[in-house]
Amino acid sequence: MARPTVIAPSEATATPRSRRSVASGQLALELPLGLPELAIAPEWKAQQRLWGHSLHPMCSYLASFPAALAHAFIARYSRPGDVVLDPFSGRGTTPLQACAEGRIGVGNDLNPFAYLLTASKVDPASPAESRTRLAALRLAWNVDSAGWLALAERVIARPGHPASWIPEAGSGRGPHDHDESVPDEVALAFHPRTLAQLLFVRSALRLDDPTDRFLAAGLTGILHGKSASYLSELMPNTFSMAPRYVREFAARTEFHSPSRDVFDCLGLKLDRLYRQPLPPSRGLALLGDARDAADRARCALREAGRPDRARLVVTSPPYLRVVKYGYYNWLRTWLLGFDARAIDATLDDAHHREPYLAFLRDVLADLRSVLTDDAVVVLVIGDVETDRGRTIRGGVGLAERVWETAAAPEGYALAGVALDDVAAGRKMTKLWGDEAGRATKTDRILVLGATESGRRRALAGAGLDIDWTWPPRALRAI
């Protein structure tokens, strides 16, 4: 096994900033002064965009790393049967990839939309369950389609009027029950028949049922986009454009969405999601604050009869001020019955540096009780330079500050930093025009050991050769 290279600053080698070239044609990346380099080549960047399990692209989600990056660390630092934890699971990339590789993936998030995506991936409905439920929904729609079509016409013609109110999401109620109003921009986005079907499905799907939850998650992934596989062409698939933009664009262009059948489009989405067999291992999804995830994870693991300590953490803490997960998913959250403003208020992601560092210290302190003695903790931390054109003070060199003020005081052992430049042309935010790629230009991957034993394991695993075939050869017998 090739021994890893650890470059530590010294009087002979230290410069204002250590530098190295990652690959031919790429800019040299900078290491924060004082942090050693962990020589893990970013091979994940050479993989196909949709590398990994077919459940990964269930729905786009901003500020998420690719499945290949998760694999690079899961393959190095865990074995089949180990628990792999992500306390900021987002769309569930780490726990799903862990389950796909025979580990026990555990994801936690405070965002109910992220929780739904994670739960749908680590505890998915079977193809038979999903398709049977979809067929039943189609039959139920056919029975009462006239009532839902009339409701959709009222929603479009008389927005906000009590006569155009709709049933609550997940209530199972019919088109003549009026619980809540519909945002004007929702009516602008869809063809009347498509809107009618969405209103029906929104009422029918119960998110506490695993099969309905899986269908709802798949539906969020086809809600809007620029091809015939999406229910509306008003917006890109990556995120929901601002409501004001939607109103102005629809008025300026006289936008009319083509008619798309919800059941047909969702059926095709299921075909894509089930292109590969379901993961060999089931995982766990938790809804709650990352600062108290450890006890909840251990309790859930024990109840499931699984090991109650994680051997690996792979996570990306929320970026400073950059992403409002409710706001950028307002149409998806409406479909699910969630309040986008309440999500953003709960997440409170607009941290300045010092409160952000204190928050991460609380998270790392809490995690200690769920980690094995030789656990490895991988933190993907982006340098945040701008937020909608405004320079963010203290956003560059964040990994060093996380180590100094959040990880080191809690007894973690530093293995080093791996670097990953963020190519603007490949980011979801490339649609933001001049702002594209400027918010986060470099991800610094901070690799820690829970103890000195974990640090030594992190160093030893850095030089391992990783199998990038999918599924990996070692897993084909699982």
Give short role names for the model-derived ranges:
Residues 70, 82-101, 105-112, 118, ...:
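Conserved proline-anchored active-site loop of SAM-dependent methyltransferases
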Residues 113-204, 338-347:
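Conserved phosphoryl-transfer catalytic core
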Residues 123, 320, 382-386:
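Short "lid" loop at the C-terminus of a central beta-strand within the Rossmann-like core
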Residues 179-315, 320:
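SAM-dependent nucleic-acid methyltransferase catalytic core
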Residues 212, 346-417:
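Conserved Class I SAM-dependent methyltransferase catalytic core
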Residues 395-399, 403, 410-478:
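Class I S-adenosyl-L-methionine
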